[in-house]
């Protein structure tokens, strides 16, 4: 792991987001998760702020290339009038394209308003996306079940959302999922991205 390059990436990304640094945290933790082999791939967004996009900064692309990750882009605007450029990031182009394929399947399985049109296709797409993003299977399966069955989001659900930053944990296996994914990524953030770690800790204290 090239720590100097990672620290430079951290600086470039957080500088772009300025006061919206938690958006930069999402990008950086996604990249780091791929680099430490926790996630086969990351699904990110080429955000636009003040009329410029994150990857307009060519140095960010140079650093990502030097770190050994590949990137596939796709512009979609299904759920809003504003076009979003999605980034599929992995160590190989094959995995990037696999994530892109299932993300397209997901988009094709829902209406413009987000209503599920084909439950079977939607469920399989979400399962495969969760797998490629490295999320614990128990968490992905519970998310799918809640959406398909229309289970009401109670206080327990909201508490888990507040406690867990990266994805929606299941009620039964929350601790196991945290140890398998969150803890490993948190430790890597503390080691390689110190400014990002400080931002995450400050945000947690603010929410608390």
Identify the role of each PLM range:
Residues 118-122:
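Internal, hydrophobic cores of structured domains that mediate oligomerization or house catalytic pockets
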Residues 123-130:
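An amphipathic, hydrophobic-aromatic interaction surface with interspersed Lys/Arg
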